[in-house]
């Protein structure tokens, strides 16, 4: 017996949609949605394809996701070619199976079933889909959200299909995410010969006490919903490659994953004060890729928890751990935002796979969420 969720997932995997190339995935989704009465608005920006689709009116529940995938790596190391979906021992293999073409298929099939049973549903059901989530994310969801906000589009609830689960589908629901702030710092010195240090100014030596103090800071202790803020040095570069040249500059890149206990401005102020304390000559560039957001218990979280408990008989953990997602952009609209998707154990890896039965389960969960919020 064929399964529409598995079949649609396989069709999507066969399209090698390396970010930001959609490779025809959205056309497939749009065709299915238009067939059940959705109005579709394509919202392409630069090399990125996006669409916003809706059916009905009133209180709005949107399902959000991305059609793009990360590169497969060495295809010879896959048990099957990465863009040729294969089921082995109940597991569906292929790039994007878990992140997140399986979720997209589950969303669309859930919508088809929901509309068939509730053709005159009272709320509005919507989809926000992009082909630029895995790469720069500059022309994807953030641009669509800006356009929707500019015309006062309504969005009450949003479910992002990112692979949130750890061991079984629904064991973890993400009801928020930490903020992400990156600092690109250059410490300026004076280049010179290592035999004549008095004629130079070594920026590595100058910066060492600053960096030692920076990494020792306890930024906060987190709270009920968020772990403590984390600061990690990601890159350090200095020198010409020669052993007899004192470098003229030191470049340090570090990233903060921060909770709602802090703002990005508070972090910046503390870093800049520390730089001044150590009397360093520097230039600094900040990149805020997302503010922290949190969806407290309410109609959306309750509907998601209910759906998971109904179909999997487990109570999901509500967590805010992990990296950023497009939920950070959607939260700007004032919507309640949660993430519910398949098990994430193999995402971005060789032999990415998902339990085929989990995708069927996910479609049922998504449909039950629709029934609770917009039926």
Swiss-Prot record:
Assigned EC number: 3.5.1.18
One GO molecular-function entry: zinc ion binding
Cofactor: how and how many bound: Binds 2 Zn(2+) or Co(2+) ions per subunit.
Pathway(s): Amino-acid biosynthesis; L-lysine biosynthesis via DAP pathway; LL-2,6-diaminopimelate from (S)-tetrahydrodipicolinate (succinylase route): step 3/3
InterPro entries per UniProt: ArgE/DapE_CS, Bact_exopeptidase_dim_dom, DapE_proteobac, Peptidase_M20, Peptidase_M20_dimer, Peptidase_M20A
Cited PROSITE patterns: ARGE_DAPE_CPG2_1 (PS00758), ARGE_DAPE_CPG2_2 (PS00759)
Keyword Zinc attached: yes
GO biological process, any: diaminopimelate biosynthetic process
Cofactor annotation: Zn(2+); Co(2+)
Pfam family, one: Peptidase_M20
Active site: 68, 133 (proton acceptor)
Superkingdom in the source lineage: Bacteria
Keywords linked to the UniProt accession: Amino-acid biosynthesis, Cobalt, Diaminopimelate biosynthesis, Hydrolase, Lysine biosynthesis, Metal-binding, Zinc
Residues that coordinate or bind Zn(2+) 1: 66, 99, 162
Reported function: Catalyzes the hydrolysis of N-succinyl-L,L-diaminopimelic acid (SDAP), forming succinate and LL-2,6-diaminopimelate (DAP), an intermediate involved in the bacterial biosynthesis of lysine and meso-diaminopimelic acid, an essential component of bacterial cell walls.
Record-linked NCBIfam families: dapE_proteo (TIGR01246), PRK13009.1 (NF009557)
Recorded family membership: Belongs to the peptidase M20A family. DapE subfamily.
Assembly description: Homodimer.
Protein's UniProt name: Succinyl-diaminopimelate desuccinylase
Source organism: Escherichia coli (strain SE11)
UniProt lineage: Bacteria, Pseudomonadati, Pseudomonadota, Gammaproteobacteria, Enterobacterales
Gene transcribed to yield this protein: dapE
